[in-house]
UniProtKB/Swiss-Prot annotation:
Heme binds at residue 442. Its cofactor is heme. This is Cytochrome P450 3A25. The keyword Glycoprotein does not apply. InterPro entries: Cyt_P450, Cyt_P450_CS, Cyt_P450_E_CYP3A, Cyt_P450_E_grp-II, Cyt_P450_sf, Cytochrome_P450_3A. Keywords: Endoplasmic reticulum, Heme, Iron, Membrane, Metal-binding, Microsome, Monooxygenase, Oxidoreductase. It comes from Mus musculus. GO terms for molecular function: heme binding; iron ion binding; oxidoreductase activity, acting on paired donors, with incorporation or reduction of molecular oxygen, reduced flavin or flavoprotein as one donor, and incorporation of one atom of oxygen. The keyword Endoplasmic reticulum applies. Its main location: endoplasmic reticulum. Pfam families: p450. It catalyses: an organic molecule + reduced [NADPH--hemoprotein reductase] + O2 = an alcohol + oxidized [NADPH--hemoprotein reductase] + H2O + H(+). Its EC number is 1.14.14.1.
């Protein structure tokens, strides 16, 4: 039996030529960083360094910093990515050269109509969307929206009390996931879902489906390894976002808009109405107003950016408070002083709680919402002696930056005092960036912080959280691309109304 197939010379030539071309494609960009004198892990043909993500992007970034220092290069398939942890260069990338060179995030896609979302849009379209949407997130608008958010904080407390009375440990993600979903649906669309008690609600189901990303999903891998397939996928109407969810939200926004126009509801205070108002503003140029498709794209991004990130952040704060009872007690004391006799929280009271702000900031340092920031270089540029070719993705690894012992003494420890009034002014804004920095930072930062703080106040006014047998200590981080704990955070919740037992 012959081991080598009996093929014609022409077939062999074609086969060998194909393999050579395939190898050239899989390695043509992989010499870039070596040529520039930038260290980094050795890439594999075609794959680059993507298999190094097996233990998680955050772990890969942390390991690279320890091995290579503040600057290193690696490859996702053929795409060169330059990692930067130097605060001076970070400032230039995110702020000084934002408009001229580093305006855009990496286009990762096919994404369908989500190209029109503020987080994905580019250059002039992004500037236009940012200009139109920024007034929606001002302190004044959020203050108007606060009563809507507070009602969901009250529902959170009721749901938590009902769970606490069962006497069983509670999954934080279940409770706070429902709260986050309710806040987003209520403030975005004026819809009351009560997602904890109505998990089969189509709104909840379609929203959760958007968030199911796996780093080694074959479809995503094909986009990373063969980026030239993206326009083909777009022609075939493929998308990294689930089609049924996208169609649901397109139709939903269209229906809601139609109903509001028919009933002349112009005084509602939610994001959909505020976006609709851009279409009707007298001083607004017609070509600048948001289209219906753009409104749908922003609505999906609010869900995508708000639901999972907010609920995970609150869950992690509760974990740290449960494992640091002294911090929890100090925070409860501040809440009780500010809101005696469980008085309803006000916007101004929430904004004035200094220790609450310290606790939230420290938790976001340890567990940043986004573990990476990315910008694409629009042209060749040299920054502080580092040459960055056009098309290179500049990546800022937030996780190791927030835990860098050069900037943070005992970086693995939970210590809210780092963010006290005395210390906060000494923190470089380019080493602490839970919501990014510069003109393209997270537009929903204030909204997210209010949502988080409102939940923390509601819980600690009424309950004390404690670790239990099911609590994973120490906490381990998942290897999935969306930052989350490896296992659900399970805690015991005890009502503060119950009389204390024992001495």
């Amino acid at each position: 039996m012959e081991l080598i197939p009996n093929l014609s010379i022409e077939t062999w030539v074609l086969l060998v030529t194909s393999l050579v071309l395939f190898y050239i494609y899989g390695t043509y960009s992989h010499g870039l960083f070596k040529k520039l004198g930038i260290p980094g892990p050795k890439p594999l043909p075609l794959l680059g360094t993507i298999f190094n993500y097996y233990d998680g992007m955050w772990k890969f970034d942390e390991d690279c910093y320890k091995k290579y220092g503040k600057i290193w290069g690696f490859y996702e398939g053929p795409q060169p990515i330059l990692a930067i942890m130097d605060p001076e260069i970070i400032k230039i990338v995110l702020v000084k050269e934002c408009y001229s060179v580093f305006t855009n995030r990496r286009f990762f896609g096919p994404v369908g109509f989500m190209k029109k979302a503020i987080t994905i849009s580019e250059d002039e379209e992004w500037k236009r969307l940012r200009t139109l949407l920024s007034p929606t997130f001002t302190s004044g608008k959020l203050k108007e929206m606060f009563p809507i958010m507070r009602q969901y904080g009250d529902i959170l407390v009721r749901n938590l009390r009902r769970e606490e009375e069962k006497g069983e440990p509670i999954s934080m993600k279940d409770i706070f996931g429902a709260y986050s979903m309710d806040v987003i649906t209520g403030t975005s669309f004026g819809v009351n879902v009560d997602s904890l008690n109505n998990p089969q609600d189509p709104f909840v189901q379609k929203a959760k489906k958007i968030l199911k990303f796996k780093i080694f999903d074959p479809f995503l891998l094909s986009i990373i390894l063969f980026p030239f397939l993206t326009p083909i996928y777009e022609m075939l109407n493929f998308s990294i976002f689930p089609r049924d969810s996208m169609n649901f939200f397109k139709k939903f926004v269209k229906r809601m808009k139609k109903e509001r126009l028919a009933s002349n509801q112009k005084n509602r205070v939610d994001f959909l109405q505020l976006m609709m108002n851009t279409q009707n503003s007298k001083g607004q140029e017609s070509q600048k107003a948001l289209s219906d498709l753009e409104m749908a794209a922003q609505a999906v991004i609010f869900i995508f950016g708000g639901y999972d990130a907010t609920s995970t952040s609150i869950s992690l704060i509760m974990y740290e408070l449960a494992t640091h009872p002294d911090v929890q007690k100090k925070l409860q004391d501040e809440i009780d002083r500010t809101l005696p006799n469980k008085a309803p929280v006000t916007y101004d009271a929430l904004m004035d709680m200094e220790y609450l702000d310290m606790v939230v900031n420290e938790s976001l340092r340890l567990y940043p919402i986004a573990i990476r920031l990315e910008r694409v270089s629009k042209k060749d540029v040299e920054i502080n002696g580092v040459f960055i070719p056009k098309g290179t993705v500049v990546m800022i690894p937030i996780y190791p930056l927030h835990r860098n012992p050069e900037y943070w003494p005992e970086p693995q420890e939970f210590c809210p005092e780092r963010f006290s009034k005395e210390n906060k002014g000494n923190i470089d804004p380019y080493i602490y960036m839970p919501f990014g920095n510069g003109p393209r930072n997270c537009i929903g930062m204030r909204f997210a912080l209010i949502s988080i703080k409102l939940a923390v106040i509601g819980v600690l006014q009424n309950f004390t959280v404690q670790p239990c047998e099911e609590t994973q200590i120490p906490l381990k981080i998942s290897r999935e691309p969306i930052f989350q704990p490896e296992k659900p955070i399970i805690l015991k919740v005890v009502s503060r109304d119950k009389p204390r037992t024992g001495s």
